[in-house]
Amino acid sequence: MIALIQRVAQARVTVEGRTTGEIGAGLLALVCAERGDTEAQAERLLAKMLSYRVFSDAAGKMNLPVQNMDGNGNAGGLLVVSQFTLAADTNSGTRPSFTPAASPEDGRRLYEHFVAQARAAHPQVQTGEFGAMMQVSLVNDGPVTFWLRVPPA
């Protein structure tokens, strides 16, 4: 399972003109399930994401996770958006292949599991809509962007 995470000052996702998710400071996570992924990969990816230290501490070092982004125990927002294109195979030609991505059914199941686990573990979780054409707007903070991956079993 893959997540492209970005540290943001704010982010929003809209579908057909209506806002489905919006956060202030925190992480925007573009999430993709790959063929062979299970709930175990989703849970490991979420655990890594929530503890990944991308926010600055008092000394200015990236040393704090989204769960404690101000160093005083206050959590930042987490905006989770499905994006199957993260699994694209771009090694040949000029058109990406999406064969490595999970099927739409498995992708939805794993995305929904990821979101449910995120909501159980983190106080501020917003989402896009799986399979929808979405507009994602953000104010990148840094920019700070990381590619996280838990390979299929």
Swiss-Prot record:
<dbReference type="GO" id="GO:0043908">
    <property type="term" value="F:Ser(Gly)-tRNA(Ala) hydrolase activity"/>
</dbReference>
<comment type="subunit">
    <text>Homodimer.</text>
</comment>
<keyword id="KW-0378">Hydrolase</keyword>
<dbReference type="GO" id="GO:0019478">
    <property type="term" value="P:D-amino acid catabolic process"/>
</dbReference>
<dbReference type="GO" id="GO:0000049">
    <property type="term" value="F:tRNA binding"/>
</dbReference>
<dbReference type="GO" id="GO:0106026">
    <property type="term" value="F:Gly-tRNA(Ala) deacylase activity"/>
</dbReference>
<comment type="function">
    <text>An aminoacyl-tRNA editing enzyme that deacylates mischarged D-aminoacyl-tRNAs. Also deacylates mischarged glycyl-tRNA(Ala), protecting cells against glycine mischarging by AlaRS. Acts via tRNA-based rather than protein-based catalysis; rejects L-amino acids rather than detecting D-amino acids in the active site. By recycling D-aminoacyl-tRNA to D-amino acids and free tRNA molecules, this enzyme counteracts the toxicity associated with the formation of D-aminoacyl-tRNA entities in vivo and helps enforce protein L-homochirality.</text>
</comment>
<comment type="similarity">
    <text>Belongs to the DTD family.</text>
</comment>
<dbReference type="GO" id="GO:0051500">
    <property type="term" value="F:D-tyrosyl-tRNA(Tyr) deacylase activity"/>
</dbReference>
<keyword id="KW-0963">Cytoplasm</keyword>
<dbReference type="Pfam" id="PF02580">
    <property type="entry name" value="Tyr_Deacylase"/>
</dbReference>
<keyword id="KW-0694">RNA-binding</keyword>
<feature type="short sequence motif" description="Gly-cisPro motif, important for rejection of L-amino acids">
    <location>
        <begin position="142"/>
        <end position="143"/>
    </location>
</feature>
<dbReference type="InterPro" id="IPR023509">
    <property type="entry name" value="DTD-like_sf"/>
</dbReference>
<keyword id="KW-0820">tRNA-binding</keyword>
<dbReference type="GO" id="GO:0005737">
    <property type="term" value="C:cytoplasm"/>
</dbReference>
<dbReference type="InterPro" id="IPR003732">
    <property type="entry name" value="Daa-tRNA_deacyls_DTD"/>
</dbReference>
<protein>
    <recommendedName>
        <fullName>D-aminoacyl-tRNA deacylase</fullName>
        <ecNumber>3.1.1.96</ecNumber>
    </recommendedName>
</protein>
